[in-house]
């Protein structure tokens, strides 16, 4: 059952019926043959599944996007293809936040190694990212200020730490703005203190690259997996430090087999901010709201993702090869971060993962069943 349907009131159901009727009437007024045959509801948007007539062209509906949004009384709509139909995604009037700790109730306690929990997909299921999959490996997170890039990075890192022991996974954090990763300073999985300055970033990357080369040279096993996360990589590269640039490129080009994963966020994914040799080796793209269709193409690497009509505040599309999945990023507020870090610290003293392979284990249930932050928001 989709995430929100179990809590849906009669007013929301009436709104859905009314919107479906409006969509069909508007399309019919333009002589477009289409019926609403299904509805999927997520915390922030609803997907109306359209069955098109044989002669109906998708572009004819795409060209009416603004008119449809105006008729429905919403800021924008997004078109997405399903396996057998077309879907029209519409913002909900009363969106609900998604919190990581609450979401963990629906996540299997035994995930594949180095798999991150990102949020909730459009079909109401937890959306995960297996970093060891060849089409993932390294990740670029892009979008305008306020779209939720840093919050998504934090959630990604915390979920990895919850499901992987320190012996199997370590994290290197680079934070040129000195704000994004500060709440994670107590993470037991940290390989080194958070690098905030240019010199600290250069030193940390030099060590990571040397470890990658040692593993290559000695044919050493790729463990522990090392996650290198950079918040606002364009700021880090803005000073033209070639050592840092080359270290990031080498990690992206050669890190996979040695057990390294590079995660970079940026609000400027253009070639002048993120070198082509680096971006080309970050195959997985998590794209939040961007300013235009051209910027969506630049960030995602493929056309027609609809990132320019996303709503911000954690509304993302994941681009994995040719597959595009819309999801709402899970939010982790300050109080929840403290709870998670305390659980991770306790688990590290016992030499275990904070989420053990049993849904009935105390360490799992005690963490997941705590209430989310009362004062959390999505800003």
Name what the model sees in each region.
Residues 329-359:
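Charged, low-complexity intrinsically disordered tails
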């Amino acid at each position: 059952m989709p995430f929100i349907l179990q809590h849906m009131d009669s007013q929301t159901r009436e709104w859905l019926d009314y919107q479906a009727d409006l969509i069909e009437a508007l399309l019919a007024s333009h002589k477009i043959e289409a019926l609403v045959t299904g509805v999927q509801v997520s915390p922030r948007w609803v997907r109306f599944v359209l069955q098109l007539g044989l002669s109906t062209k998708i572009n004819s509906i795409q060209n009416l996007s603004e008119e449809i949004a105006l008729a429905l009384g919403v800021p924008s709509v997004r078109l997405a293809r399903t396996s057998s139909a077309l879907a029209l995604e519409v913002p909900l009037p009363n969106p609900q936040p998604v919190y990581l700790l609450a979401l963990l109730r629906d996540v299997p306690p035994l995930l594949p190694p180095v798999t991150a929990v990102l949020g909730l997909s459009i079909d109401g299921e937890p959306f995960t990212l297996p970093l060891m999959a060849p089409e993932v490996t390294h990740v670029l997170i892009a979008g305008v200020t306020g779209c939720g890039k840093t919050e998504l990075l934090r959630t990604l890192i915390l979920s990895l730490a919850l499901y992987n022991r320190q012996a199997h996974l370590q994290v290197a954090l680079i934070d040129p703005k000195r704000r994004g990763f500060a709440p994670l300073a107590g993470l037991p999985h940290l390989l080194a203190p958070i690098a905030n300055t240019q010199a600290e970033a250069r030193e940390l990357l030099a060590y990571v690259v040397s470890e990658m080369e040692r593993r290559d040279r000695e044919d050493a096993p790729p463990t522990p997996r090392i996650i290198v996360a950079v918040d606002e990589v364009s700021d880090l590269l803005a000073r033209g430090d070639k050592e840092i640039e080359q270290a990031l490129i080498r990690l992206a080009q050669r890190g996979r087999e040695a057990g390294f994963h590079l995660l970079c966020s940026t609000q400027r994914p253009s070639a002048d901010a993120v070198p082509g040799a680096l971006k080309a080796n970050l195959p997985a793209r998590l794209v939040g709201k961007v300013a235009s269709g051209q910027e969506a193409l630049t960030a995602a690497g493929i056309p027609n993702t609809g990132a320019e009509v996303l709503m911000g505040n954690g509304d993302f599309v994941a681009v994995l090869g040719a597959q595009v999945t819309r999801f709402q990023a899970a939010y982790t507020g300050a109080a929840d971060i403290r709870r998670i870090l305390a659980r991770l610290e306790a688990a590290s003293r016992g030499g275990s993962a904070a989420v053990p392979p049993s849904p009935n284990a105390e360490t799992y249930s005690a963490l997941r069943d705590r209430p989310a932050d009362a004062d959390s928001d999505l800003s």
